[in-house]
């Protein structure tokens, strides 16, 4: 099989694992046995040509609430494990969908985007991102490789970003002080 076949099969497997993780972690709020079924179907755009200001965006995986879809973009600079093949990355993006469904009621353009004052800190988005990092890490605990607090490391070339997103960092934890 060629690279894209392996990548798509890996992405499919990782989305299945992420769905199972959320099905196990989040009980059905109505106790009707649905679990994470509310996030189905998982729509995925693979190797998508996404443009921002006319430039193609590469080296990323996203959940885009306004199209209710995951977008796996072509890689260019990231030459390690492709993002679709990294369970932590896929679980991280799935966590964004869960947050959109559970906290934002499936809003295509969540209210916090419209009311954001442009400052570099947005509490709700930061909470979404932090929870996504936690779930990206937690989903890796189900695999043979065990828990990977630096789940971005196999895929990401930027050591600074990997270190910043390392969920085992004590200095990044919020305290009561």
PLM features per residue range, with description:
Residues 1:
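Non-catalytic ligand/cofactor/substrate-binding and regulatory segments of enzyme domains
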Residues 4, 8-91, 99-177:
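Zinc-dependent metallohydrolase catalytic domains
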């Amino acid at each position: 099989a060629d690279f894209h076949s392996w990548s798509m099969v890996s992405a499919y497997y990782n989305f299945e694992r992420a769905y199972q993780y959320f099905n196990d972690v989040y009980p059905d709020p109505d106790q009707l046995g649905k679990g994470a079924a509310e996030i189905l179907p998982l729509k995925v755009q693979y190797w998508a040509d996404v443009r921002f200001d006319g430039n193609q965006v590469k080296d990323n995986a996203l959940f885009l609430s306004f199209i209710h879809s995951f977008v796996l973009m072509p890689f260019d600079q990231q030459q390690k494990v492709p993002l679709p093949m990294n369970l932590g990355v896929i679980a991280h993006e799935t966590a964004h969908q869960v947050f959109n469904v559970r906290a934002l009621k499936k809003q295509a353009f969540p209210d916090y985007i419209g009311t954001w004052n442009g400052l570099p800190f947005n509490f709700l988005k930061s909470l979404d991102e932090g929870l996504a990092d936690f779930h990206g890490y937690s989903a890796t605990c189900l695999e043979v490789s065990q828990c990977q607090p630096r789940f971005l490391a196999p895929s990401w070339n930027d050591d600074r970003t990997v270190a910043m997103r390392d969920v085992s960092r004590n200095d990044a934890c919020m305290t009561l002080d």
